[in-house]
UniProtKB/Swiss-Prot annotation:
GO terms for molecular function: DNA binding; transposase activity. GO terms for biological process: DNA transposition. Belongs to the transposase 11 family. It comes from Escherichia coli (strain K12). Signal peptide: none annotated. Disulfide bonds: none annotated. Pfam families: DDE_Tnp_1 (PF01609), DDE_Tnp_1_assoc (PF13808). The gene is ybfL. It comes from the Bacteria. This is Putative protein YbfL.
Length: 378
C-alpha cells in the first residue's frame, strides 16, 4: 500500500486554476486533506485546523512554503477537481500497490451519501458504488451515480476500470443483469448474483426447483453452519446444483451460467425457545464452479462490504451526517475516505479498530508517521 505512488498518481490531476494566482499547490492540498481525514477530520475547518497544528510535520512530506490554506480555499480547490481523473488515479494506485489472488471475492455495492443533497441547487443525494476486496478489506474502486436505480448502468463502467480476471464478483439483486454477467465473463471473472423479483422468470424457476421439501432434505450438494450471537441463534443451509435439463435455456440467456444456489437461514431468539424460527430463503446464480461450502464462504464474504466498509463510513467517519456538497466535493471526499480506510487497514502494527487508529493518528505524530511509512511514504 504505497502512499508515495498515490502522490505520484495525484500529481498528474490537472489543476484548472490560473497558474499565476496559485499560492498552494494542488498536490499539497490533497496531501493535507488525506492526512487530516486519516486523523479524523470531517469538515473543511477540521482540515485547516489539522494543517495549522501539524505544519512542521506536513513540511516533511510536501511543499507548504506558503503555510496552510484557509478552509475556503481547500473547499474551493477540492470541489473543482475532476472526479473522473481522481477515480482513475485511485484505481491506478490500487492496481500498482495491491495484488489479489484468484480466490478473492470482489463485492460490488452502493451507498447513498444522505446529506450530499443540495436543495438550493436542486441536486439530489449522490450514490457511490464501491468495489471491495473482501480478502484484504480494501476498496479497489468506486464510481458515482445520481440514484440507486442507476447502478445497472454504473456497474459496467466500474468493471471497465478493474482487473477482475480470476475473481468472483458478487452483487445484490440490482446487479443481477445479463449484460453485467456477460461483461464479467468477457473480462475473465466469474459472477455470483442474488436473484429476486426483478428477474421474475428466473425467480419463479428457483421456487419450482427448490420447494420446501427440497430445502428441508436437500438432494444436492449442501453445507450447513450455525452461529450464536446477540441472544440469537441462526442455522444457515447452503445448496448448490448444476443447471438441470429443464432449465437449460437459462444458460443461453446468462453467459457462463453453471450453478443454481440457495441459501436458507433459520433464525430464532434463544430466550424464546417455543417460538418458531424465522426462515429466509435467498436464491443465487453463478458462473463459478462452486461447492456448497465455497458458496457459503462467498456470500458471507459479500457482507464484508457492509460490515467493514459501509459501517465504518457511517459509524466511525460519520459519512451520512457530512454536509460537504459544494461542486464535486461530496464525491471527492468519499474517495478520500476510502483512501484513509485503505491506509489505516494496511497498518498491522497497532492492532485496534479504525476509530482508535484515527484518534491515535490525530494525537501521536510518531504513530501517524509510522502509518505513512508503512504505506511507503517517509
Amino acid at each position: 500500500m504505497e502512499l508515495k505512488k498515490l502522490m505520484e498518481h495525484i500529481s498528474i490531476i490537472p489543476d484548472y486554476r490560473q497558474a499565476w494566482k496559485v499560492e498552494h499547490k494542488l498536490s499539497g492540498i490533497l496531501l493535507l486533506t488525506i492526512f487530516a481525514v486519516i486523523s479524523g477530520a470531517e469538515s473543511w475547518e477540521d482540515i485547516e485546523d489539522f494543517g495549522e497544528t501539524h505544519l512542521d510535520f506536513l513540511k516533511q512530506y510536501g511543499d507548504f512554503e506558503n503555510g496552510i490554506p484557509v478552509h475556503d480555499t481547500i473547499a474551493r480547490v477540492v470541489s473543482c477537481i475532476s472526479p473522473a481523473k481522481f477515480h482513475e488515479c485511485f484505481i491506478n494506485w490500487m492496481r500498482d500497490c495491491h495484488s489479489s489472488n484468484d480466490k478473492d471475492v470482489i463485492a460490488i455495492d452502493g451507498k447513498t451519501l444522505r446529506h450530499s443533497y443540495d436543495k438550493s441547487r436542486r441536486r439530489g443525494a449522490i450514490h457511490v458504488i464501491s468495489a471491495f476486496s473482501t480478502m484484504h478489506s480494501l476498496v479497489i474502486g468506486q464510481i458515482k451515480t445520481d440514484k440507486k436505480s442507476n447502478e445497472i448502468t454504473a456497474i459496467p463502467e466500474l468493471l471497465n476500470m478493474l482487473d477482475i480476471k480470476g475473481k468472483i464478483i458478487t452483487t445484490d439483486a440490482m446487479g443481477c443483469q445479463k449484460d453485467i454477467a456477460e461483461k464479467i465473463q468477457k473480462q475473465g471473472g466469474d459472477y455470483l448474483f442474488a436473484v429476486k423479483g426483478n428477474q421474475g422468470r428466473l425467480n419463479k424457476a428457483f421456487e419450482e426447483k427448490f420447494p420446501l421439501k427440497e430445502l428441508n432434505n436437500p438432494e444436492h450438494d449442501s453445507y450447513a453452519m450455525s452461529e450464536k450471537s446477540h441472544g440469537r441463534e441462526e442455522i444457515r443451509l447452503h445448496i448448490v446444483c448444476d443447471v438441470p435439463d429443464e432449465l437449460i435455456d437459462f444458460t443461453f440467456e446468462w453467459k457462463g451460467l453453471k450453478k443454481l444456489c440457495v441459501a436458507v437461514s433459520f433464525r430464532s431468539i434463544i430466550a424464546e425457545q417455543k417460538k418458531e424460527p424465522e426462515m429466509t430463503v435467498r436464491y443465487y446464480i453463478s458462473s463459478a464452479d462452486l461447492t456448497a461450502e465455497k458458496f457459503a464462504t462467498a456470500i458471507r464474504n459479500h457482507w464484508h462490504v457492509e460490515n467493514k466498509l459501509h459501517w465504518r463510513l457511517d459509524v466511525v467517519m460519520n459519512e451520512d451526517d457530512c454536509k460537504i456538497r459544494r461542486g464535486n466535493a461530496a464525491e471527492l471526499f468519499s474517495g478520500i475516505r476510502h483512501i484513509a480506510i485503505n491506509i489505516l487497514t494496511n497498518d498491522k502494527v497497532f492492532k485496534a479498530g479504525l476509530r482508535r487508529k484515527m484518534r491515535k493518528a490525530a494525537m501521536d505524530r510518531n504513530y501517524l508517521a509510522s502509518v505513512l511509512a508503512g504505506s511507503g511514504l517517509s
